Amino acid sequence: MVERLRDVSKFANIQDMNWTVSYFNERVQREITEWPVGIYADYLRLILLMEAHGADLRLPHSRAMGDGLFELRCKNVEGIGRAFYCTMIGRKIVILHSFIKKTQETPDRELKTARKRLKEVKHAQ
């Protein structure tokens, strides 16, 4: 059906379910799986949305942090989780860093780690 709609209008904004999500390293992936169950469930829901529709979720689910860095905002009664990510050529999303939020502001240390990893990923491209 998607192909048929594309034939009808070249301007149709239909995205296939072919975005892939990967992790900066195994530690990042493991840390996220160790989040409280409710926060992790919200994370998985948002990841499925990104795989289906791309990385442009917007607030309240995602927020641009500048220079190609984005923040995935996972929330539940158990707390708040944040996962920083970037997009790559070829419909790829890379989860760079994650943490459980304990204060109103995003700690500088967490943001610096994400920005450093963003540079590493972009330079390896």
Where are the regions a protein language model picked out?
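Basic, Lys/Arg-enriched alpha-helical interface segments
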Residues: 1-80, 89-93, 100-125
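Portal/gating segments that form or line small-molecule/metal binding sites
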Residues: 83
